Amino acid sequence: MSRGPEEVNRLTESTYRNVMEQFNPGLRNLINLGKNYEKAVNAMILAGKAYYDGVAKIGEIATGSPVSTELGHVLIEISSTHKKLNESLDENFKKFHKEIIHELEKKIELDVKYMNATLKRYQTEHKNKLESLEKSQAELKKIRRKSQGSRNALKYEHKEIEYVETVTSRQSEIQKFIADGCKEALLEEKRRFCFLVDKHCGFANHIHYYHLQSAELLNSKLPRWQETCVDAIKVPEKIMNMIEEIKTPASTPVSGTPQASPMIERSNVVRKDYDTLSKCSPKMPPAPSGRAYTSPLIDMFNNPATAAPNSQRVNNSTGTSEDPSLQRSVSVATGLNMMKKQKVKTIFPHTAGSNKTLLSFAQGDVITLLIPEEKDGWLYGEHDVSKARGWFPSSYTKLLEENETEAVTVPTPSPTPVRSISTVNLSENSSVVIPPPDYLECLSMGAAADRRADSARTTSTFKAPASKPETAAPNDANGTAKPPFLSGENPFATVKLRPTVTNDRSAPIIR
């Protein structure tokens, strides 16, 4: 394909402009993209390092397992191998920055200046040569015009030959300049592309070596890694032997087995005794809902010796919900006979009414406790005479001592504060009339208490007469002796009641 000098000249100039207007700006963009690539790879290497550090930590956890120790070591080795490969990749990308990014940055600044100067020099020389050629051609035309109308033709002919030679030499010179300029421009362009290819080939060689090194390293370790996780349900022989020993233990106990403490053994004996009792006895009904009614005169029927056990029993009942095993341990520590059931004696009559889960009894009856623990003021026991079982208020009974007789004891004031303190002078043989207990009618009791408080405000100088010991008082419906002052007058006219604050879960506070 033949081209004229002007066409070649245009190709030369377009080549220079292509380098300056397309290649160099593209190179600048490539440098920016390469820097972003570097940042991404560095971030990937850091993230990979953190990831494989986590793999190593999990491997350390696995090494503590009796069946996964080998897998733990494999995880640690995988972590170290990949971190080593990441370090090698980091070194390769340092070369990428040094051999490509840094070199391109250095070349681009120099090349812009060089290409501008080269193109300008080419255009200037081409213009000068072209002007010289045109000037010689103009002189040749002038000589030819003069020689045509002149008589001395030989004189102009000699000059014409000289100008023709000059024009020819200058045409050859300018053509050679255009050809050399075009070649130089194309080579300059090629050198730049070649430089870019050469730098990336060098980096590719580093990456190739990195991949060969990685493949060699992974090929030497990967089969052994895969072998450790082929059978996930395989248990090491040592662990299997240990499991078999646990399945078939020897006849002699292990010397290092801890023995139970004596207190726990005694608590277990008590618990077994209660379990045996619950198995042999019929099914126990649930305790009534609500707290049992507490008689305000209960302490008057307790001996000093029995008042403390009663208070202890109330205290123990309040702490029952906290820890049953503790109360059983305390019962054992107090010396109670575990094999002997506790008995109580009734001090007030009690009527069950229509509730089949409650127990009815009269005053002075003996009840065997089937459950020695109170539940909200209720006890569960069996009547010694009727053999009936049921729940009853604990405040209607007192502990039965072995040497206690059936005689009525003298009521003594309780050492602990009671809800009301009477100033009536009661004789030793007289007894207080006890109203029929009915714990279900709390509202009627509250009204009766209000009426007694109103009657206490009236001023009366009545004093209860002492009953004669030689005359026996008749019994009322409750089984208690009828006092001689039941003549319709108020026996508690001189009683002054102190204001109290009653809390169902605590003793009254006297102000």
Swiss-Prot record:
The modification Phosphoserine is found at residues 261, 281, 331, 354, 414, 420, 422. Interacts with RAC1. Binds to F-actin. Interacts with FASLG. Interacts (via SH3 domain) with E.coli effector protein EspF(U) (via PXXP motifs). Identified in a complex containing at least WASL, BAIAP2L1 and E.coli EspF(U). Interacts with E.coli intimin receptor Tir. This is BAR/IMD domain-containing adapter protein 2-like 1. The IMD domain is predicted to have a helical structure. It may induce actin bundling and filopodia formation. The keyword Signal does not apply. GO terms for molecular function: actin binding; cadherin binding involved in cell-cell adhesion; proline-rich region binding. May function as adapter protein. Involved in the formation of clusters of actin bundles. Plays a role in the reorganization of the actin cytoskeleton in response to bacterial infection. Phosphorylated on tyrosine in response to insulin. It is found in: Cytoplasm, Cytoskeleton. InterPro entries: AH/BAR_dom_sf (IPR027267), Baiap2l1_I-BAR_dom (IPR030060), I-BAR_dom (IPR013606), IRSp53/IRTKS/Pinkbar (IPR027681), IRTKS_SH3 (IPR035592), SH3-like_dom_sf (IPR036028), SH3_domain (IPR001452). The modification Phosphothreonine is found at residues 248, 257, 412. Transmembrane segments: none annotated. It comes from Homo sapiens (Human). One of its GO terms (cellular component) is extracellular exosome. CDD domains: I-BAR_IMD_BAIAP2L1, SH3_BAIAP2L1. The keyword Transit peptide does not apply. Changing residue 146 to E: Loss ability to induce the formation of actin clusters. Residues 1-249 form the IMD domain. GO terms for biological process: actin crosslink formation; actin filament bundle assembly; plasma membrane organization; positive regulation of actin filament polymerization; regulation of actin cytoskeleton organization. The gene is BAIAP2L1. Residues 302-328, 451-511 are annotated as: Disordered. Residues 483-511 are annotated as: Binds F-actin. Pfam families: IMD, SH3_9.
